[in-house]
């Protein structure tokens, strides 16, 4: 695994957590819109099979979302621990890129470096991470 692949693990884990959250919210919205019954007629108190299945599906989506969030937290901490010890501008560039998930343009503004300057620093920082991963 290269240094860049290692550092990008958090971005991927965060993306997966957002996907699971969106799926959960979509399912919740669908259940809410389908389960409304406003015809005024009594329907009994038994939970119907479709309602039970929908609740189980929703619970499964919620569990997947929470597990993905926990994974993202674990991966973020692992990446953060690697970056934390890197001093100077190299550490700051890595932190902004791989922990705060900033775009290159935002990093240039934050550290007051040109695009090329930030990429040179990033290249040096990746070499430091690569040496620590071995």
How does the language model describe each region?
Residues 1-82, 106, 133-134:
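N-terminal interaction/assembly modules
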Residues 75-78, 86-90, 121:
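N-terminal positioning helix adjacent to the helix-turn-helix/winged-helix DNA-binding module
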Residues 85-102:
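Short amphipathic alpha helix immediately N-terminal
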Residues 114, 118-132:
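DNA major-groove recognition helices of helix-turn-helix
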Residues 100-117:
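Helix-turn-helix DNA-binding module
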């Amino acid at each position: 695994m290269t240094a860049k692949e290692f550092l990008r693990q958090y971005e991927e884990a965060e993306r997966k957590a957002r996907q699971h959250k969106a799926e959960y919210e979509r399912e919740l919205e669908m259940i809410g819109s389908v389960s409304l019954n406003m015809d005024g007629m009594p329907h009994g108190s038994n939970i119907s099979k479709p309602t039970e299945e929908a609740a189980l599906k929703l619970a499964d989506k919620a569990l997947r979302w929470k597990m993905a969030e926990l994974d993202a937290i674990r991966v973020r901490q692992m990446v953060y621990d690697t970056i934390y010890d890197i001093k100077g501008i190299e550490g700051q560039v890595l932190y902004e890129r791989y922990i705060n998930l900033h775009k290159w343009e935002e990093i240039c503004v934050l550290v007051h470096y040109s695009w090329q300057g930030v990429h040179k620093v990033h290249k040096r920082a990746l070499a430091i991470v690569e040496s620590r991963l071995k």
